[in-house]
């Protein structure tokens, strides 16, 4: 239980930390997006996945999603919570793919308890372009 004033202090601390992290991650996201675009420009199919430590509402996610599709958005159900510790519940693990793939059946496997992240997976059907 937080004492009077403590909740506000904790909120300000969290917002400050999130802002600092966003400033560091923005150039990283832009670098990844440029790298991905080089392959897309060569018509190379792309799958990009991992622990991005950023929610679907983040600058990082928006930057990557300009070039690639979020497979969970395309074929998942519900919030898709992949991080589940310390009272924080977000989808910060992502699978992205180019238009060369159709995603289906995206899920979070919340039966795995050995990590603070649940695995996220989906099926991808390759659909080559003519």
Model-derived segments and spans:
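Metal-dependent phosphoester-hydrolase catalytic domains
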Residues: 26-47, 52-130
């Amino acid at each position: 239980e937080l004492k009077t004033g403590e909740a506000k202090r904790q909120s300000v601390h969290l917002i400050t930390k999130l802002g600092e992290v966003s400033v560091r991650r923005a150039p990283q996201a832009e670098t990844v997006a440029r790298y991905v675009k080089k392959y897309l420009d060569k018509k190379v199919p792309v799958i990009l996945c991992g622990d991005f430590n950023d929610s679907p509402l983040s600058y990082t996610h928006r930057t990557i999603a300009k070039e690639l599709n979020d497979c969970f958005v395309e074929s998942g159900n519900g919030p898709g919570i992949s991080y589940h510790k310390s009272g924080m519940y977000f989808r910060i693990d992502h699978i992205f793919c180019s238009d060369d793939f159709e995603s289906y059946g995206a899920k979070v496997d919340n039966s795995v308890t050995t990590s603070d992240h649940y695995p996220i997976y989906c099926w991808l059907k390759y659909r080559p372009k003519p």
